[in-house]
Amino acid sequence: MAGQSLRRSAWVPLLLRLLLAGIAACEASPADDGAGPGGRGPRGRARGDAGADEAVPRHDSSYGTFAGEFYDLRYLSEEGYPFPTAPPVDPFAKIKVEDCGRTKGCFRYGKPGCNAETCDYFLSYRMIGADVEFELSADTDGWVAVGFSSDKKMGGDDVMACVHDDNGRVRIQHFYNVGQWAKEVQRNPARDEEGVFENNRVTCRFKRPVNVPRDETIVDLHLSWYYLFAWGPAIQGSITRHDIDSPPASERVVSIYKYEDIFMPSAAYQTFSSPFCLLLIVALTFYLLMGTP
């Protein structure tokens, strides 16, 4: 018995020594293992490399540190710059009036020689595959529209309008004229819509299919229609009555397959274009030259 107790007491110091060595090994971190000469940091960089004098951050277990390191790895490139975001929307391409009468049809209403940026109202159309592309622009901060009518009068017309809302956006909406009022139609044939409000003008561009299923509120554009031109103010993104009592209209039906550049003088520039006015001027001139009897 005495011999067994002696052998046990000889093993105790050895066991204590092994236990202390194990505890010391558990307390050592991975970064400490590579801290000696020739060792490597947590990202594999040799201690002798450039930047060795910089302090290498230790990997803490807190959520904030983890989230920050995850962001660095997920959203930063190798050079440390953020990855590029989606490119911004392309700016609105300027309407090319030089193509009027050649590759697209145009209507200009306003001052003689005006263009898409100076006319009171401007519209262009052209065929692109199975669609018709329309471009509209008007001197207004509200809305600009074109109506497709079987006559020159408002009522029972298919209308496409570009509306400037309170958020600064220009939206393409579909309406159906009921008498003098425009009722919005949920079925909107417009596609590839874009619009802008600049220099107190509403300008937009969109495409619409040539052929559509038969419907009371939408017409087939492969047929010829009178075009009605209108524009006016908007309140909280809703259109109100147009600016002039009798909106201009095309003199004859319009075919989308025929490109013309048609100018229509506004009221301020058509005073002397009326035959009655011309006759009155001639009569007054003759009266002044001949004198009174």
UniProtKB/Swiss-Prot annotation:
Domain of life: Eukaryota
Region Disordered: start-end pairs: 30-61
Entry annotated with the keyword Transmembrane: yes
GO biological process: regulation of AMPA glutamate receptor clustering; regulation of glutamate receptor signaling pathway; regulation of postsynaptic membrane neurotransmitter receptor levels; regulation of synaptic transmission, glutamatergic
PROSITE patterns recorded: DOMON (PS50836)
Biased composition (Basic and acidic residues): 46-61
DOMON domain sequence ranges: 119-234
Keywords tagged on the record: Cell membrane, Membrane, Signal, Synapse, Transmembrane, Transmembrane helix
Cellular component terms per the entry's GO annotation: endoplasmic reticulum membrane; plasma membrane; postsynapse
Tissue-specific expression: Expressed in the brain (at protein level).
Subcellular location: Cell membrane; Synapse
Signal peptide: 1-28
Database matches in Pfam families: DOMON
Keyword Protein transport: no
Major location (coarse): membrane
GO molecular function: dynein intermediate chain binding; protein-containing complex binding
Transmembrane intervals: 271-291
InterPro entries linked to this entry: DOMON_domain, FRRS1L
Record's subunit section: Component of the outer core of AMPAR complex. AMPAR complex consists of an inner core made of 4 pore-forming GluA/GRIA proteins (GRIA1, GRIA2, GRIA3 and GRIA4) and 4 major auxiliary subunits arranged in a twofold symmetry. One of the two pairs of distinct binding sites is occupied either by CNIH2, CNIH3 or CACNG2, CACNG3. The other harbors CACNG2, CACNG3, CACNG4, CACNG8 or GSG1L. This inner core of AMPAR complex is complemented by outer core constituents binding directly to the GluA/GRIA proteins at sites distinct from the interaction sites of the inner core constituents.
Protein name according to UniProt: DOMON domain-containing protein FRRS1L
Lineage, uppermost ranks: Eukaryota, Metazoa, Chordata, Craniata, Vertebrata
